[in-house]
Amino acid sequence: MNHLESKFGQFGGMYVPELLIPALDQLEQAFIDAQNDPEFQKEFMELLTDYAGRPTAMTLSRNLVSNPNVKLYLKREDLLHGGAHKTNQVLGQALLTKRMGKTEVIAETGAGQHGVATALACALLGLKARIYMGAKDVERQAPNVFRMRLMGAEVIPVNAGSGTLKDAVNEAMRDWSATYDKAHYLLGTAAGPHPFPTIVREFHRMIGEETRAQIMAKEGRLPDAVVACVGGGSNAIGMFADFIDEPSVQLIGVEPAGKGLHTAEHGAAIGKGTTGILHGAYSYIMQDEDGQIEESYSVSAGLDYPAVGPQHAHLHDIGRATYAAVTDDEALYAFQLLSRKEGIIPALESSHALAHALNMADEAEDGTIIVVNLSGRGDKDLAHVHSILGGQTNE
């Protein structure tokens, strides 16, 4: 690997202030060098295996699908150390930070999962972590805030704007503009300016690679579809990457429909957005007629982002991937169903993918194999869901 493409079709690019371009160029070169360095790869794989717990399991659902001739598998990223897929690429970027000779890490977080992953990687590798989090998210994700602080990270609440993920990204980028000589901005999703979408995809690629090997071992063939939730789109691109060149495998991303796509309260950037630039990349974003960024909404803090990674925008445009949307209510139902039927409490983000996969399974032909990326576990969401349901679960 000697060069990275900065765009996916028309999407992507590096739309940032000029003073950040040297930092992004340095990051791209460090990543290319690392990808070609067997020692870096060895250290990364050792951390993934011995610290994070890869490979993660693939579980056949026993009780969710009514048709016994349709198989629904769960790729268990919820079992990864840190509680979600986020740990994969954070370990990779933290190693890159050290490789560049930097001592500090800046990050943004929504649900707090990326923040937790950043905090644990920085604790392990001796880096100082500053994590920006929307004030609203600090309130609804209190356990993760305490986890981050417990592991030595500084958590900075952001009151600007709507006090959510978009605003946290703005503050993190502002910080990085002033400190990039000693700090690395550890972006948490497959969005943002080049080279972030490519780096994040490559550091999550093992999700799809393991899925391929596991399904071949269990079924002797590739799945008919892989399904993953999409906010910025990192867990989905990690799942999709190894299957993009396999036309027999449907790639299905699931966006948050919130209170319904007919309302203003959703986060479906591909489903309802238009093209534009946000956080350094050209992609589908939620904006009004004047180009002002609209507030995204989802019951799940981690999907509450008003744009989508540029490779997803491209996969949508060329028809290689399909993007559906699932409402809060559908996701909450799937959250409870998996808990009650299988004893696995999924993250609200992952519950969106599960809800859509269950609908697919209901309509699927005999012999269909579907894999859902269970991107995280639901511990962080228990208090939030408890308050929504008023302590009642839907029997």
From Swiss-Prot:
Catalyzed reactions: (1S,2R)-1-C-(indol-3-yl)glycerol 3-phosphate + L-serine = D-glyceraldehyde 3-phosphate + L-tryptophan + H2O
Keyword Acyltransferase: no
SUPFAM superfamilies for the chain: Tryptophan synthase beta subunit-like PLP-dependent enzymes
Cofactor names: pyridoxal 5'-phosphate
Domain of life: Bacteria
Family note: Belongs to the TrpB family.
HAMAP family per record: Trp_synth_beta (MF_00133)
Protein name, as recorded: Tryptophan synthase beta chain
Annotated organism of origin: Pseudoalteromonas atlantica (strain T6c / ATCC BAA-1087)
